Amino acid sequence: MDLMRAILDGIAISAIFNGAVAVLALINPRYFDSYPKAIQKAAPEQMTEKEKKINLVLTILICGICLIYSAASLLHTGISGFWNFFWMGYFQWSILNLGDFFLLDCLLFQGKYKDRIVIPGTEGHPDYEFGNWMRHLAIMEHFVVTPFLIIPFVAVIQALIVEL
């Protein structure tokens, strides 16, 4: 396993993912359903079917690009074996997850551009406050669900693809 390569590839897919999500969230925050449920329910207008479809397409597109990049990079590492591919993928996607937490949840959603990514009609909702945001969304998402469920699943799929 090439740990340095895994770290660099993780930074690259993190930049792709977080850059795309940040730009799209700033364009229209309603395109993403990654807000705490209380904020989503407080919105005067719920996500329309069109917005849900856009969310699904963007999610598949952005994650697909990251998966293709990551798998292609693994093919060119010169390593072999399912477990080597799995752990390289796990490290890559873990770095993306940490980038998502620090860049999107901490800096974008809680930082300088906080007012630009508010769903219209939910201004001043208490779940936009840092502590509530972390408690109701970010901690569970980034330190429980993603590292123990989503990343292992994606790393297995990626390792199987690369092994073929």
Predicted ranges, named:
Residues 103-124:
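Juxtamembrane non-transmembrane "cap" segments at the membrane-aqueous interface
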Residues 2-20, 83-102:
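Alpha-helical transmembrane segments
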Residues 69-91:
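Cytoplasmic juxtamembrane interface segments
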Residues 23-44:
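Membrane-interface helix-loop junction between the first two transmembrane segments
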Residues 4-5, 46-58:
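Membrane-water interface at loop-to-transmembrane-helix junctions
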Residues 39-51, 118-138:
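Short membrane-interface loop/juxtamembrane segments of multi-pass integral membrane proteins
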Residues 55-74, 139-152:
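Core segments of transmembrane alpha-helices
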Residues 153-164:
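Juxtamembrane boundary at the C-terminal end of a transmembrane helix
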